[in-house]
Amino acid sequence: MKNEKAVVVFSGGQDSTTCLLWALQQFEEVETVTFHYNQRHQEEIDVAKRIADKLGVKNHLLDMSLLNQLAPNALTRDDIDIEEKEGELPSTFVPGRNLVFLSFASILAYQIGARHIITGVCETDFSGYPDCRDEFVKSCNVTVNLAMEKPFVIHTPLMWLNKAETWKLADELNALDFVKNETLTCYNGIISDGCGECPACKLRKKGYDTYMEMKEAK
């Protein structure tokens, strides 16, 4: 795969940044695509651009604000609380988001001559989001290939990793500190360790602490 081109679906968070670093070791040429869907915080867009610039990677920014009209949710609306209720999808779930993102990433890949598309979705710590499942990604891969008559390959390096294992991968890529300090996972728009209170921050911290304990125990 070293002599091929890839597109990374990129938000500037822990997962997509780890995927970008993985892709840079796997492919000759890598570009990123970031989607603006009226997220609560402009910081996500700024962080994605800053990380891409630091890594010397081209960043495409696409306007997906229509998503907010179709599917109001806690990631885009200040008047919707971020909460998780047992037996229900979290209020941060955006219906169809990954379907739209992967479709548009495939269109971009078509235009720039890339065959590989990388996304940081995973089924292990997926908060119940149905569009983070392996079954969905494989189905989407077949669909975009049929739609464009191209042999795209959608890669999911984190699909079967939990958060601790994702930190381990970042460490193996010699980028543990970079991912910890430069990325934005927090739903409240705070870089690095975040607010420590939202579900994303708690999951990230739990994974980091678990990995560091495993590392120190060796």
Swiss-Prot record:
Entry annotated with the keyword Cell membrane: no
Pathway info: Purine metabolism; 7-cyano-7-deazaguanine biosynthesis
Catalytic activity: 7-carboxy-7-deazaguanine + NH4(+) + ATP = 7-cyano-7-deazaguanine + ADP + phosphate + H2O + H(+)
UniProt GO molecular function: ATP binding; ligase activity, forming carbon-nitrogen bonds; zinc ion binding
Requisite cofactors: Zn(2+)
Binding site for Zn(2+): C186, C195, C198, C201
Pfam families, A to Z: QueC
Gene3D superfamilies referenced in this protein's UniProt entry, alphabetically: HUPs
UniProt keyword annotations, A-Z: ATP-binding, Ligase, Metal-binding, Nucleotide-binding, Queuosine biosynthesis, Zinc
Domain of life: Bacteria
Cofactor descriptive note: Binds 1 zinc ion per subunit.
GO biological processes: queuosine biosynthetic process
Function description: Catalyzes the ATP-dependent conversion of 7-carboxy-7-deazaguanine (CDG) to 7-cyano-7-deazaguanine (preQ(0)).
Self-association state and partner proteins as the record states: Homodimer.
Protein name: 7-cyano-7-deazaguanine synthase
Source organism (scientific name): Bacillus pumilus (strain SAFR-032)
